[in-house]
Amino acid sequence: MNSRILSLAAAALSLAASTVQADEWSANFAASNNYIWRGLTQSINESAISGGIDFASDSGFYAGTWASNVSYAADDVYSYEHDLYAGFAGEASGISYDLGYLYYNYDAEAEFDFGELYGSIGIGPFTFGLNVLANTEADEGPGQDFGFGEATYFYTDYSTTIGNGVDLGFHIGHHKGDFSEAFNGVPGDYTDYNVSIGKDGFSFMITSTNLDDAGPDALDNDDIKFVVGYSLDIEL
């Protein structure tokens, strides 16, 4: 989901820098053979279809909604993820910034909705970001703490164009806190990393984590995963 927000923040920043001031509505659609979130499958390593609608203002403000199918086991209560987000993106002294709030909504039976505050800065081809748990409806287990700031995700991205419109990206992120263990069945502290290439909406990513035999076997979150996808953005 973070990649969707980064794209929207970039659009808001582009509008703010444009000499032609105009608000912008857009829609997006994507399909892939796996839904990966912070190195972990959200679709039991099966295909996912997603889409959303976004608004970006020339003031730097943006907001949007996004949804995808999800599953964590063959018989679990999760079937969809529906996100709502809003933020503000801008640039100062050649450094871009993005601040916002993201709410993750799941099936009512799951009772695991949660929200995060996020922020990032961009310096040249690098982006440094931090997501912080803000609130959740999930119940804490013994010894767990789901309070504000008790789960964090820090990441660094590097992106560049290598010619002929081919985009190359590298990512590394680190999660810390009890919430990931409760939600995804993996240890609270872990690192994920990936490398990706993309062109004209098509993308290919190799991703993995430093986990070792963690979580349900069906999720294989300690294995290297190959993700192929296609995305389409439409101006409304």
Model-assigned labels for residue ranges:
Residues 2-8, 13-236:
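Outer-membrane beta-barrel proteins
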